[in-house]
Amino acid sequence: NYMAHQEIHALVRSALAARAGRGAYRLLDLGCGNARLLADTLREFPPAHYVGVDLSRPALAEAAQQLRGLPAVELREQDMLSCVASQADDSVDVIYSSFAMHHLSTAEKARLVVQIGRALKPDGQWILVDVVRAEGQSRDTYVREYREMMTRSWADFAPEHIEQVWGHIAQFDYPEPVTSLAAMARAAGLTEPNVLGQFGPHAAMTFALPR
């Protein structure tokens, strides 16, 4: 639970439970991976239609097994930007993304958020789980401090495994501060972020498209 998956998933479960209580909903999962962490919640509060998108074919194959039994599942081997851009206007009730958006550049994130705002139905919700930088924290400082946190806290990981994970972070992670995400959301017509919880750099938040 080094990335607070248990705590964050409980928050996501509550958000989806609240949405399911309002009636049938369509969910788009950006960067779904193998869908393992979300599968139980989706079985508890099944969407009328689930679309999961990821670039990893093996992960999607595993997701198909994890999501077996849901009413309608569509899995796509596609990047997040093109997937959201292909959605019709006002067509999705919930857009969910977990630990995926930070791989995009700032400009790509801004374009993605605009497309999210376009694709959501009025009163639709974007649930974002991701790493974030502290206000005023540079990316270099974030990467260094994340490595320090792993070295200090990831007791069950061998040093060479920590170095491997850190190498991936140093090369591919480009997290934003919450204020930057808020500015992108405003530009897309979304509400200010409702931060459900933050555990170090790991955060869960929701945005909504006003009615």
Please annotate each region the language model reported.
Residues 4-23:
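Conserved alpha-helix/loop element of class I SAM-dependent methyltransferases that forms part
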Residues 23-33:
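Conserved class I S-adenosyl-L-methionine
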Residues 28, 36-83:
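Class I SAM-dependent methyltransferase SAM/SAH-binding core
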Residues 96:
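A conserved beta-strand element that flanks and buttresses the S-adenosyl-L-methionine
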Residues 99-100:
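Short catalytic micro-motifs in class I SAM-dependent methyltransferases
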Residues 110-122:
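A short glycine-rich, Lys/Arg-flanked "PGG" loop and its adjoining helix->strand segment in the class I
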Residues 129-187:
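C-terminal alpha-helical "lid/dimerization" subdomain adjacent to the S-adenosyl-L-methionine
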Residues 191-211:
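Core SAM-dependent methyltransferase catalytic element
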